[in-house]
Design a protein with these regions (language model features):
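A late C-terminal transmembrane helix in Major Facilitator Superfamily
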Residues: 335-371
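Conserved MFS/SLC helix-loop-helix module at the cytosolic interface between two early adjacent transmembrane helices
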Residues: 63-99
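Helix-breaking motifs and short loop linkers at transmembrane-helix boundaries and internal kinks
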Residues: 44, 76, 97-103, 131, ...
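Extracytoplasmic gate region of multi-pass secondary transporters
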Residues: 32-33, 212-266, 327, 331
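Cytoplasmic helix-loop-helix junction between adjacent transmembrane helices
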Residues: 107-146
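Helix-loop-helix hairpin linking two adjacent transmembrane segments in secondary transporters
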Residues: 142-188
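Residue-level signature of mid-helix packing/kink "hotspots" within the transmembrane helices
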Residues: 30, 58-66, 150-151, 258-262, ...
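Juxtamembrane intracellular "pre-TM" segments in multi-pass secondary transporters
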Residues: 2-7, 191-218
Length: 406
């Protein structure tokens, strides 16, 4: 596999391209989250309605992830990613024409469907182009574009908003998608990217919903990483209303929480590869790291109790750092019990289940924001990852899994 991609640096180009596409996808989806205080004020939408708009994206994203996973596993990366990014680029621009609940929800749902290919494409690329002992870091690179996009969105989009308004910001997101499609037209000519794996010849079963390991994976991914969605979609509203910060100020500081997400991908990816090289029980190594994630995630409950913007941003940073650990380690767990033939579907199930959890919770948390029950919202968002960790401990117990030793 290494020889197909040329030298050491060239080997990482496909993963780097997936970093770029996940970065763009998160700029696209976070533009609404960043500008929510202004958009809600100008359109008259409530926090609960905003939650339903987020849910429209999340439901479509949830349904699309396993679909794109199957498409990418069978039709290949080149065609699958070209179709997906073309779809979401059009949907992103459609936000510029929205003005109410239903138009925003429709544009958001179309965006969610297209972006459902992001993480299946990233994992498919990593397992197809990198050797096994580099896949933890490769996954961190491919997936970290999302967290990097969340970091960069306020820094890039805020000036565009100040110059051309929130509708102009959505036009900009469409142009970024077109730029990536041009890059992909070149990178996807590489033989290891163009290759279509013949999944049908695999002798190992893929993920099935009656398999306890699938539910263990879903618990970690969907519930453990839920604070990422909560912070992404609610941080601007929390800073604007109870803390009284302006849209311009929010744009200057909202990169701080997702920086924890970005750093978490790199740290947890490195720790995962380090644990793999040590050998021993994969499950025990994952259990130790997941315990660290669970303990660290508890500090998020303090957010509504601390004074000042700086303290709030620090706690959000730590929450996203811990949540990224749940995400990386859940994928490492799934890759240890299923073969690379099912990589796209694995990523699709994980990201889809996370999106389903966000779709269920955001209207509820949005309603709590409407009635100023901020403490309850943060405490619920803190408790959910602990439930995911406990669920994984129960469902992944050795001796009940079969297959590989995890």
């Amino acid at each position: 596999m290494a020889s197909e991609g040329g030298g050491t640096i060239a080997r990482w180009v496909p993963a780097g391209t997936m970093l770029a596409v996940s970065l763009i996808s998160y700029i696209d989806r976070n533009t609404l989250a960043l500008l929510a205080p202004t958009i809600l004020r100008e359109t008259g939408l409530s926090g609960e309605q905003y939650g339903f708009i987020i849910a429209a994206f999340s439901i479509a994203y949830c349904m699309a992830n396993p679909v794109w996973g199957k498409i990418l596993d069978r039709a290949g990366l080149r065609r699958g990613m070209t179709l997906a990014v073309s779809c979401w680029t059009v949907a992103s621009v459609a936000h510029a024409f929205a003005g109410g609940l239903w138009s925003f929800a429709a544009a958001r749902a179309a965006l969610g469907f297209g972006e459902g290919a992001t993480f299946p494409g990233g994992l498919r690329t990593v397992v197809q182009t990198l050797p096994e002992d580099r896949r933890g870091r490769g996954l961190a690179v491919a997936y970290s574009g999302g967290s990097l996009g969340a970091v960069l969105t306020p820094l890039i989009v805020t000036p565009i908003f100040l110059w051309w308004g929130w509708r102009g910001a959505f036009w900009f997101t469409g142009f970024t998608g077109l730029a990536w499609l041009g890059l992909w037209a070149v990178v996807s000519k590489r033989p290891e990217v163009r290759r279509v794996r013949q999944v049908a010849v695999s002798n190992t079963p893929g993920p099935r919903m009656r398999d306890r390991r699938v539910w263990a994976y879903i618990c970690l991914y969907a519930l453990g990483a839920l604070p990422i969605g909560f912070v992404l979609y609610s941080a601007s509203l929390y800073l604007a209303h109870p803390l009284g910060r302006s849209q311009a100020f929010i744009g200057k500081v909202l990169w701080i929480p997702p920086l924890g997400w970005e750093m978490g991908y790199l740290v947890w990816g490195w720790l995962t590869d380090r644990g793999l090289r040590k050998g021993g029980s994969r499950r025990e190594s994952l259990r130790r790291m997941l315990t660290w994630c669970a303990v660290l995630s508890l500090v998020f409950a303090l957010t509504p109790l601390v004074p000042g913007t700086v303290s709030v941003l620090v706690l959000m940073f730590l929450a996203m750092f811990a949540a990224s650990g749940f995400l990386v380690l859940s994928v490492a767990y799934a890759n240890s019990v299923y073969t690379a033939d099912h990589a796209g579907l694995i990523a699709g199930v994980g990201a889809g289940s996370w999106s389903a959890a966000v779709a269920v919770m955001m209207p509820i948390l949005g309603r709590l924001f409407d009635v100023h029950a901020y403490a309850a919202a943060f405490w619920i968002a803190t408790a959910i990852p602990m439930c995911g960790f406990v669920g994984w401990l129960v469902l992944s117990r050795e001796g009940e899994l079969g297959g590989k030793d995890v």
